[in-house]
């Protein structure tokens, strides 16, 4: 079973990825993990990726695609995998098709976890952290007993810059703009399966299982 998992930040992709790889016994392959492994193993592509990252530059497609090609050729990916964070562009999606074709296989499905932007905003901007002990709260899902104070030590709660409304909204807008052409690409190929990510976590996974039952 060869899958790509998609979803905007806050959609619950990580939770579903954990359940998918456990149930179907396939490796969870994320771009971050691939880069780290390639750099740790000091491969040629890993060295190239490191040089770009050390300079604060984006890793070009030819390097990213090469690292993906190496990873998907490994033994543990022969019977399936869950790709997370790749592809990000239509060009990368086309290259993924070429990589899989060279390996004598193809993608089975692309699962997209859909959540309304307003819901994502609530999920992502509600996080507050205790300055003293680092305990995390969420103003909707896990609020402190006293607003602005930590339950454990009474420490002041603060919000990281990444979790502030303007930052989150900008990140979501950028992601939505990037993702749309990719969703259209896979929809035209008949590979795209969208799931309502606003349900309970277990209900989302039930929907995932229904899709994967046909493969």
UniProtKB/Swiss-Prot annotation:
Q: Name one GO cellular component term.
A: cytoplasm
* Residues the entry annotates as binding Zn(2+): 130, 133, 150, 153
Q: What class of enzyme is it?
A: transferase
Which reaction equation describes what this protein catalyses?
AMP + ATP = 2 ADP
Q: Where does ATP bind?
A: 10-15, 127, 136-137, 199
Q: What is its EC number?
A: 2.7.4.3
Q: Name one Pfam family in it.
A: ADK
Q: Cite the annotated pathway.
A: Purine metabolism; AMP biosynthesis via salvage pathway; AMP from ADP: step 1/1
- Can you tell me where the transmembrane regions are? none
Instruction: Fetch the InterPro entries from UniProt.
Output: Adenyl_kin_sub, Adenylat/UMP-CMP_kin, Adenylat_kinase_CS, Adenylate_kinase_lid-dom, P-loop_NTPase
Q: Which domain of life is it from?
A: Bacteria
Write out the ranges of the annotated region (NMP): 30-59
Q: Please give the PANTHER family that the UniProt record associates with this protein.
A: NUCLEOTIDE KINASE
What assembly does the database describe for this protein?
A: Monomer.
Which family is it part of? Belongs to the adenylate kinase family.
What this protein is called in its record is Adenylate kinase
Species this chain originates from = Listeria innocua serovar 6a (strain ATCC BAA-680 / CLIP 11262)
Q: Which gene encodes it?
A: adk
């Amino acid at each position: 079973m060869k899958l790509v998992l998609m979803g905007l930040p806050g959609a619950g992709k990580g939770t579903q990825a954990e359940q998918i790889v456990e149930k179907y016994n396939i490796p969870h392959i994320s771009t971050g993990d691939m880069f780290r492994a390639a750099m740790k193993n000091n491969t040629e592509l890993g060295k190239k990726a490191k040089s770009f990252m050390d300079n604060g530059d984006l890793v070009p497609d030819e390097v990213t695609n090469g690292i993906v090609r190496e990873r998907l050729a490994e033994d543990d990916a022969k019977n399936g995998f869950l790709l997370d964070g790749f592809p990000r562009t239509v060009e990368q999606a086309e290259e993924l098709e070429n990589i899989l074709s060279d390996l004598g296989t193809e993608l089975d499905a692309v699962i997209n976890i859909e959540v309304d932007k307003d819901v994502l905003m609530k999920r992502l901007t509600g996080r507050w952290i205790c300055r003293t002990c680092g305990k995390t709260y969420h103003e909707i899902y896990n609020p402190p007993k006293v607003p602005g104070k930590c339950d454990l030590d009474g420490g002041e709660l603060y919000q990281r810059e990444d979790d502030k409304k303007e930052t989150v909204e900008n990140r979501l807008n950028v992601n939505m703009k990037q993702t749309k052409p990719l969703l259209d690409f896979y929809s035209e190929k008949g590979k795209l399966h969208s799931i309502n990510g606003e349900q309970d976590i277990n209900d989302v996974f039930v929907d995932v299982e229904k899709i994967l039952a046909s493969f």
